[in-house]
């Protein structure tokens, strides 16, 4: 079986030169996938200044380098209210398909233009759902923030804010076209299946879990600390919920009078949220740790009271799954696909988005009741070990591919 992936990252291409957490879960999948007999894998991704094709350790890589768009073209994209012309990109994708001649094509994510190639090839195309831009855009701003407020932070950045918003809107329109064009989907949650069927009611949907980063599979022991420690891994977009962390931490400190440490990993720009909440992260025992390697995050999770996930929207965040497989109790907002990962009060806790009061109560409860904490964490680990079993995931993926290929042949 010849398989072509279009991905948002280079996966293991030049893996030794990467500095930022490797290639993530797709690189983990690649390592397992290429060990299967009778599988030939090619991976294509955007990366300028590279050859058209590179073969390395049994994988064929196709870095894509687009010709630079003229300024007038960029201006048209910025001002346009319709899906832009992606003929140049589609032509590049078709060259790769023609060169590799795959039996099946998997597009990882609907965030970029890869999926637009589906109507132009007879090869079956399946979309691996990651996030879905349209509902993400709907939840982009916390309830106390407007686009006007966001633009007024720095008048000098007004044009940049407009461009960012316009890019999101255009990407959502492009995604809508992709979801209409692709017939086959692989997802993991009730949420991503429901949303996909809104855009494409007749699509064929297959379940497929994701492989986590390697350090989280290694045998590890969770040790509850005597002091209260909370860990979170998020990124900078406002919908990731840093405001909920600030508000929850304030209740823990000023109302419940608890001593604690809250370590937040990832690229965080706190100034805007601090200004709008009136809470500075230093004043409520929060430590911004920046980007860290998987092993460091793993050790922090193994030695914390709980893992807190504050997003206003998410599908199946790997940060939550990584905490679960380590046996850590997760408190998360009840949004998007997260209820497919966590059963409330069984293998974790779910709270409404923007509810710092329940969040603070549950953190306090887990700190005081170590038996409850350990039981919930153990339940989470049992579920996550099954969900993220490497062999099962790869076997399921190949089975999905074969079903899609067979279905495609029947429909010709």
Which residues fall in each region the model found?
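Membrane-proximal helix-turn-helix segments that form the acceptor-binding/catalytic region
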Residues: 28-29, 133, 149-185, 198
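Aromatic "clamp/platform" in nucleotide-sugar-dependent glycosyltransferases that forms part
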Residues: 312
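Conserved acidic donor-binding segment of nucleotide-sugar-dependent glycosyltransferases
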Residues: 344-345, 349-356, 365-370
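Short hydrophobic beta-strand element within catalytic cores of glycosyltransferases
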Residues: 329-332
